[in-house]
């Protein structure tokens, strides 16, 4: 049995090959009630560190993006939840998607944030995001906050591949 015959047999049985992009577009809006705030972070392509008198230049790699997002969310959790986060009780729920644009523009992280404290004032969020982004040296100063809705999830899943969801960072 060759590959074509296997696909024909699966089609006859009603078992279609799943498309990751379609599956993400169907699944992510179900999380809409959990995630209220949409955020876009621009990543630097390179940065440097001073080691004594020696200047060391670092470049952004795709393998480091999960760690960059985790560090940013950690800093944001510390400033929003304070002691409740430090004692590991409460934290933000997050989803992020990497927008690569295949080298035509700088890499972006599009994220959705949810599970804020009940007494949290959302007007203070841009300042907290700016402070957390400044503490993460890989993130550029440019950032944007929006209201998270169904259109936002459709936009961020535009960058999900048909065969895998490697661009999605589940948090």
Language-model segment annotations:
Residues 90-92, 107, 137-140:
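Residue-level signal for beta-strand positions within conserved beta-sheet cores that form or flank
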């Amino acid at each position: 049995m060759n590959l074509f015959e296997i696909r024909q047999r699966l089609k006859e049985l009603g078992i279609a090959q799943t498309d990751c992009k379609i599956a993400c577009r169907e699944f992510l809006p179900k999380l809409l009630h959990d995630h209220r705030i949409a955020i876009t972070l621009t990543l630097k392509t390179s940065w440097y560190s001073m080691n004594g008198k020696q200047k060391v230049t670092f470049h952004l790699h795709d393998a480091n993006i999960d760690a960059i997002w985790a560090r940013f969310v950690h800093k944001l959790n510390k400033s929003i939840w304070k002691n409740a986060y430090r004692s590991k009780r409460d934290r933000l729920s997050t989803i992020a998607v990497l927008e690569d644009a295949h080298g035509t523009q700088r890499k972006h992280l599009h994220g959705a944030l949810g599970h804020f404290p009940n007494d949290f004032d959302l007007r203070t969020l841009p300042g907290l995001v700016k402070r957390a982004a400044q503490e993460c040296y890989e993130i550029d100063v440019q950032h944007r906050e929006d209201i998270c809705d169904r259109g936002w999830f459709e936009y961020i899943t535009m960058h999900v591949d048909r065969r895998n969801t490697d661009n999605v960072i589940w948090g």
